[in-house]
Curated annotation (Swiss-Prot):
This is Cytidylate kinase. GO terms for molecular function: ATP binding; CMP kinase activity; dCMP kinase activity. HAMAP family: Cytidyl_kinase_type1 (MF_00238). Keywords: ATP-binding, Cytoplasm, Kinase, Nucleotide-binding, Transferase.
């Protein structure tokens, strides 16, 4: 009888704190970690590198099907490797993020990357970070968490992150981009951003990251144990 590899999914909008939570869960359980959003960002960056038309689904599908991407754990979470090059920092720019969100609206692009994401499900278990992990990619996941926060709070967090890295950012522009991305993600025809019916919904707007981790760990351990 085939052994079912356990999965914990963490979905939610950009900037809600999913990445930090998933890294904490992966460390606590000793499981693999999949940053599905990074896959779309890597695809977007690959399209920019290879001058592929990001508005053309036909052009993006073969690139997605043959995407050379690896995730290597490190002290800070994950190193994202594209075609042998560490692009962990490059894929986190707002330009790449917005391009990735556009690419994610294409059904055949999502299908090409769906198979790749499911291949990350290996023993002893997987923590999956994304927007449709609990609804589309791993609907049979044992634990599903939907992490949310207000657009204003997410813009504030993102601004601080970028400033710490030396980027000069405008809060209002950042807030506008987050709202636009939210609208695209929540209203796209294929796999819109929505909480799974059996997910624990956590609003992190007024919570510290430690409180989010504590609540999520308690919930996950109760189910997984």
């Amino acid at each position: 009888m085939a052994v079912i590899v356990p999965v914990i999914t963490v979905d939610g909008p950009s900037g809600a704190g999913k990445g930090t939570l998933c890294q904490a869960l992966a460390k606590a359980f000793g499981w693999h970690l999949l940053d599905s959003g990074a896959i779309y960002r890597v695809l977007a960056l690959a399209a920019l590198h290879h001058h592929v038309d990001i508005t053309s689904e036909d052009a993006l599908v073969p690139l997605a099907a043959n995407l050379d991407v690896r995730f290597i754990p490190n002290e800070n979470g994950l190193s994202v490797i594209l075609e042998g090059e560490d692009v962990s920092t490059e894929i986190r720019t707002e330009t790449v993020g917005n391009t990735a969100s556009q690419a994610a609206t294409f059904p055949r692009v999502r299908e090409a990357l769906l198979r790749r994401q499911r291949a990350f499900r290996t023993a002893p278990g997987l923590i999956a970070d994304g927007r449709d992990m609990g609804t589309i990619v791993f609907p049979d996941a044992q634990v599903k968490i939907f992490l949310d926060a207000s657009a204003q709070e997410r813009a504030r967090r993102r601004m601080l992150q970028l400033q710490e890295k030396g980027f000069n950012v405008n809060f209002e522009r950042l807030l506008s981009e987050i709202k636009e991305r939210d609208y695209r993600d929540r209203n796209r025809a294929v796999a819109p951003l929505v909480a799974a019916k059996d997910a624990l919904i956590l609003d992190s707007t007024s919570l510290s990251i430690d409180e989010v981790i504590e609540k999520s760990l308690a919930y996950a351990k109760k189910i997984c144990n």
